[in-house]
């Protein structure tokens, strides 16, 4: 999935236009801090949108429907999750995820909700948003050995971490991420590839600066990310373009898939002149649209 667009649940205009954004995944955002009355209305709007587009998505396969909920240290995350699950989303993005225990707790609640709603067990995926606070950033590495099977991707929170550490900038000279943020970002990419799941880049929020946005997306792809979050439909085309596979990448993916098809039980194979692990097989299948 190349483009993931984040849609504020309280923004009626944005929700109405979401289906036409062209993004591969539409994420209805229920994690934004709002007044209680607005929060309740946002949940209703999110639930209604997810329900309304459920059959359309199943029939046409145009986009996936996701919801972003507040962290499990908030008082209203269960209400947000309940509203989202009424529409049977493809998955949940967990904001301010503190680590593996948060993921396990969310997975356990999802199992109960799926059973109550008559959904297939474990059908709802999870993408944790990591590194919002210093202590959370330091715990990211543990996910390499303790990742729940529901987790299909990882993303991160540059702005949240920058605020938490009192950083005065997100990027340094040349547009490079400042060192603490780059550390978190690198862990997200490495763990995602180690586990054969998606690595999703933090959004570029200056909607008016398309040229810089394109460069940011191209850099993210060059650094190993598989997709990126958009905050406006205008960003979707250049995200999709930046993350489109090259002919050489498609050719290599075909060779990897063919090699493992011929020897499906092998833990690794030599393809061309290099050793290929099974985690690369998963990535090759995703690249070819087989996953």
Identify the role of each PLM range.
Residues 1-291:
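Expand to "…catalyze enediolate/carbanion chemistry for C-C bond making/breaking, isomerization
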